[in-house]
């Protein structure tokens, strides 16, 4: 008998009046907001403009959702196109079913389009948003908890998740919460990328490649624990092979990129340059205007000093002329007196 377990929600949908709020969709939305928030902070710290990450996310997120859904439907086509299934269910994304591989691939295409429109380098943008994507995955995985899906093998561990209703016909009970394992792993991946980026100044897409490699390593062993139906190739689940292949590509990219383009590239946005130039021009104009005002004020002070000096010197000259006239008069009087004595 289980002493403790993680209870599953009694329902995955809450109704706010006439509006249904599905737990799966809510987790995805929260994850997107967290990814954009963290990505924006990292982008600005690298020299980019605020708002660029959100603008590019407008392209990346829809592409990612479409790609994730396509990957899920293609790899699990029997759930929608086999006998007795309704193919319309393939469009019901709110009921769950997103493949992270398709989401990352198509999301990268959308981000590339958005980055080109903004004139920013795609590798630098990918490095900035990498840990945010990992956190978004950590939050999004809790959507599986709301839908009671993608759990692992049966277990009586204290942290087992209780499954009360199963759509695949399995017996209700307690199972490994693989959604929780992957959520915690993704948080660790985000912290790893942030630390490595600060420690080694990762650039040219290497921070994003590190995120991909680290996620694939965790996904490989977590995939072994899942019991949901999946295609197998040579004894391994399809997602195991995908994780292994993508992991090798990411590691190869890190090695080759570090050799060819070491260090971190400078982020220069066209809009950021213009804004900086406008600020510089305004500052130059202010300085120039201040200097002109000071020169004009100095000229006025000089004119006032000249006038005052002239006014001061004029009385001195007049006084000198008066003294000369008085001396001549005194001399005349003296000469007259002498003449009178002689006579």
UniProtKB/Swiss-Prot annotation:
> Which key words tag this protein in UniProt?
Cell membrane, Membrane, Transferase, Transmembrane, Transmembrane helix
Q: Say where the protein is mainly found.
A: membrane
This entry's Gene Ontology molecular function terms read: phosphatidylglycerol-prolipoprotein diacylglyceryl transferase activity
Q: Where is this region: Disordered?
A: 269-343
Major enzyme class: transferase
One GO BP annotation is: lipoprotein biosynthetic process
* UniProt membrane topology term: Multi-pass membrane protein
Keyword Repeat belongs to the record: no
- Residues noted as binding a 1,2-diacyl-sn-glycero-3-phospho-(1'-sn-glycerol) in the record, renumbered to the chain: 141
In what pathway does it function?
Answer: Protein modification; lipoprotein biosynthesis (diacylglyceryl transfer)
Recorded GO cellular component terms are: plasma membrane
Quote the biased-composition stretches of kind Basic and acidic residues, using this chain's numbering: 283-293
EC number(s) in its UniProt entry?
2.5.1.145
Q: Where in the cell is it found?
A: Cell membrane
Where is the chain membrane-spanning? 19-39, 54-74, 93-113, 119-139, 176-196, 202-224, 238-258
Functional summary from the UniProt entry: Catalyzes the transfer of the diacylglyceryl group from phosphatidylglycerol to the sulfhydryl group of the N-terminal cysteine of a prolipoprotein, the first step in the formation of mature lipoproteins.
Q: Record's HAMAP family?
A: Lgt (MF_01147)
State the family named in the UniProt similarity comment for this chain: Belongs to the Lgt family.
Q: What is this protein called?
A: Phosphatidylglycerol--prolipoprotein diacylglyceryl transferase 1
Supply the source organism for this entry.
Streptomyces coelicolor (strain ATCC BAA-471 / A3(2) / M145)
């Amino acid at each position: 008998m289980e002493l403790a377990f993680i209870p599953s929600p009694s329902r995955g949908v809450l109704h706010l009046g006439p509006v249904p709020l599905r737990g799966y969709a809510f987790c995805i939305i929260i994850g997107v907001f967290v990814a954009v928030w963290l990505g924006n902070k990292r982008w600005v710290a690298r020299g980019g403009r605020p708002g660029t990450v959100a603008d590019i996310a407008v392209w990346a997120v829809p592409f990612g959702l479409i790609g994730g859904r396509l990957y899920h439907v293609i790899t699990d086509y029997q759930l929608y196109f086999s006998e007795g299934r309704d193919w319309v269910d393939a469009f019901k994304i709110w009921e769950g079913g997103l493949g992270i591989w398709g989401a990352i691939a198509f999301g990268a295409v959308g981000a590339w389009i958005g980055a080109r429109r903004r004139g920013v380098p795609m590798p630098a943008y990918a490095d900035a948003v990498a840990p945010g994507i990992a956190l978004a995955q950590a939050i999004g995985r809790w959507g599986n908890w709301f839908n009671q899906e993608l759990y692992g093998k049966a277990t009586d561990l204290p942290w087992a998740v209780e499954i009360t209703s199963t759509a695949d016909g399995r017996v209700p009970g307690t199972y490994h919460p693989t959604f929780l394992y992957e959520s915690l792993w993704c948080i660790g991946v985000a912290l790893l990328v942030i630390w490595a980026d600060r420690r080694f100044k990762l650039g040219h897409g290497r921070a994003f490649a590190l995120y991909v490699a680290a996620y694939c390593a965790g996904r490989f062993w977590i995939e072994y624990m899942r019991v949901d139906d999946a295609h197998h190739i040579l004894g391994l689940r399809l997602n195991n092979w995908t994780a292994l292949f993508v992991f090798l590509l990411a590691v190869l990219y890190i090695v080759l990129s570090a050799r060819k383009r070491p260090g971190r590239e400078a982020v220069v946005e066209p809009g950021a340059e213009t804004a900086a130039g406008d600020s510089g021009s305004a500052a130059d104009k202010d300085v120039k205007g201040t200097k002109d005002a000071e020169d004009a004020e100095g000229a006025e002070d000089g004119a006032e000093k000249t006038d005052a000096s002239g006014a001061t010197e004029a009385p001195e000259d007049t006084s000198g002329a008066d003294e000369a006239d008085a001396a001549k008069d005194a001399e005349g009087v003296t000469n007259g007196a002498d003449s009178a004595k002689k006579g």
